[in-house]
Amino acid sequence: MASASFVKPNTLSSPWIGQRSFAHTSASSSPPPRVSFAIRAGAYSDELVKTAKSIASPGRGILAIDESNATCGKRLASIGLDNTEDNRQAYRQLLLTTPGLGDYISGSILFEETLYQSTKDGKTFVDCLRDANIVPGIKVDKGLSPLAGSNEESWCQGLDGLASRSAEYYKQGARFAKWRTVVSVPCGPSALAVKEAAWGLARYAAISQDNGLVPIVEPEILLDGDHPIERTLEVAEKVWSEVFFYLAQNNVMFEGILLKPSMVTPGAEHKNKASPETVADFTLTMLKRRVPPAVPGIMFLSGGQSEAEATLNLNAMNQSPNPWHVSFSYARALQNSVLRTWQGKPEKIEASQKALLVRAKANSLAQLGKYSAEGENEDAKKGMFVKGYTY
């Protein structure tokens, strides 16, 4: 695995950099020798870069269906279905066998159960994705737990055993991974919570790359709160500054990662709603200040926005060139229409798959900066924010 992009060393403040000594010399001395950094190279370096670029391809984004079984059960309950493995399998089969999905979707994040499941005809879901030119991914974190010593904040579990699990996921066909941790603005956030989130993401990213998986780095800044957009920007800049500091400390190769940030918006309970142009301006300002251009792709989460809102905001961010591929990694903002259409009825599978393609195509156009909200139905404009949302 290769190391991250480097900041120019300050040779005046550090006598030792990269195991090289810098002696201060007089003006008449010959120029100091060039510094060479040892780059860690692993067997997966080229593959990681190739995978990341494949996912960050024009007009395509990520379909996230990595909800835990409990969360998937809530989705099924909303249409009157029991939370059984058969029902979860049927829903995932509906999504992953949608004809033409690969035209708009480049990667799909799966829950562990889904990675090992197959269609009723015996074809693995991994093969369904590969045949559609979609890269299979896997959620690897083990959820959130209260962070002792913090302001009622949380930390993300799952580092124990991650290396061996990642190796198994790679053998099963996964080529990228996702780790979701959260930051709450109303809770501070505390310096402890931000550092814990950043360090955990960095360790996960390094372990993933060592095992052939492109890590999606996701410190979700929750929509909870009544704060203005300026406060969200302040917190986002702090969080991403810490994240990239620790990614570099852990020798993570920036060219072999993808980011899954929250858009910079006001808190969900703020009195004023931001326009897509304002969201784009604040979000791109944050990214340009904190994210190196070596990163190939920014795959936004929807975070409880309505389907139409998430698409409009993404479209606004693609009205001018960006240093990175700016796209989507949506769950609810792609699936909500599908569930409403399906209702668990076999005769509605085709209509449900068409509903998925409508949303996928809309976001594909938004990635290209060509989306228009004309013709969007009222259901697509309904917000999906859930306070304290858990995956």
Swiss-Prot record:
User: Where, per the database record, does this protein carry N6,N6,N6-trimethyllysine?
Assistant: 387
Q: Which InterPro entries match?
A: Aldolase_I_AS, Aldolase_TIM, FBA_I
Listed binding positions for substrate are: 88, 178, 302-304
Question: What reaction does this enzyme carry out catalytically?
Answer: beta-D-fructose 1,6-bisphosphate = D-glyceraldehyde 3-phosphate + dihydroxyacetone phosphate
Q: Which Pfam families match?
A: Glycolytic (PF00274)
**Enzyme Commission code:** 4.1.2.13
Please describe the organ and tissue distribution of this protein's expression: Expressed in roots, and at low levels in rosettes leaves, cauline leaves, stems and flowers.
GO CC, sorted alphabetically, is: chloroplast; chloroplast stroma; chloroplast thylakoid; mitochondrion; plastid; plastoglobule
The record describes its post-translational modification as: Can be trimethylated at Lys-387 by LSMT-L, but the trimethylation has no effect in vitro.
Query: One of this protein's GO BP terms?
Result: glycolytic process
Say yes or no: keyword Chloroplast present: yes
Q: Which GO terms describe its molecular function?
A: fructose-bisphosphate aldolase activity
- SUPFAM superfamilies reported for this sequence: Aldolase
Q: In which pathway does it act?
A: Carbohydrate degradation; glycolysis; D-glyceraldehyde 3-phosphate and glycerone phosphate from D-glucose: step 4/4
UniProtKB keywords: Chloroplast, Glutathionylation, Glycolysis, Lyase, Methylation, Phosphoprotein, Plastid, Schiff base, Transit peptide
Q: Where in the cell is it found?
A: Plastid, Chloroplast, Plastoglobule
* Residues carrying the site annotation Necessary for preference for fructose 1,6-bisphosphate over fructose 1-phosphate: 391
Q: Which residues carry this modification: Phosphoserine?
A: 150, 208
Transit peptide: give start and end: 1-40
Active-site annotation: 218 (proton acceptor), 260 (schiff-base intermediate with dihydroxyacetone-p)
Q: What induces it?
A: Down-regulated by oxidative stress. Induced by fructose and sucrose. Down-regulated by abiotic stresses.
By sequence similarity, the record places it as follows: Belongs to the class I fructose-bisphosphate aldolase family.
Question: Subunit composition?
Answer: Homotetramer.
Task: Write out the function statement from the record.
Answer: Plays a key role in glycolysis and gluconeogenesis.
Q: What is this protein called?
A: Fructose-bisphosphate aldolase 3, chloroplastic
Q: What is the lineage of its organism?
A: Eukaryota, Viridiplantae, Streptophyta, Embryophyta, Tracheophyta
The gene that this protein is the product of is: FBA3
